[in-house]
């Protein structure tokens, strides 16, 4: 089994457990160049989203693939979710290790007011 398949299996397993709880989830996806975050409700509708592809986020950054970019995305997605009335979420790391950019995004979202 290759690295990507292992990550996807971990992601599916964790996602099913979160769906059983029936709570909003903060989903993270990362590529070498960008990082994406979405808050999704139990009915699979996107409540809030932010990524380094967006102009509002990108213009504040020097690079889009580092920890500082992840912190900015975490802050933006948390602010947008709170505007929509979502404060409690489950963190769905999509099978990625809780380290580096994924951890930075989570910490920034917590500091901005999301609870998980």
UniProtKB/Swiss-Prot annotation:
Cellular component annotations (GO), alphabetically ordered: cytosolic large ribosomal subunit
Domain of life where this protein originates: Bacteria
GO annotation (BP), single: translation
Keywords: Ribonucleoprotein, Ribosomal protein, RNA-binding, rRNA-binding
InterPro entries assigned to the protein according to its UniProt record, in alphabetical order: Ribosomal_uL18_bac-type (IPR004389), Ribosomal_uL18_bac/euk (IPR005484)
Gene Ontology MF terms: 5S rRNA binding; structural constituent of ribosome
Gene3D superfamilies per the UniProt record, alphabetical: 3.30.420.100
PANTHER family per record: 39S RIBOSOMAL PROTEIN L18, MITOCHONDRIAL, LARGE RIBOSOMAL SUBUNIT PROTEIN UL18M
Assembly notes: Part of the 50S ribosomal subunit; part of the 5S rRNA/L5/L18/L25 subcomplex. Contacts the 5S and 23S rRNAs.
Family affiliation: Belongs to the universal ribosomal protein uL18 family.
NCBIfam families: L18_bact (TIGR00060)
Described function: This is one of the proteins that bind and probably mediate the attachment of the 5S RNA into the large ribosomal subunit, where it forms part of the central protuberance.
Name of the featured protein: Large ribosomal subunit protein uL18
Lineage: Bacteria, Pseudomonadati, Pseudomonadota, Gammaproteobacteria, Alteromonadales
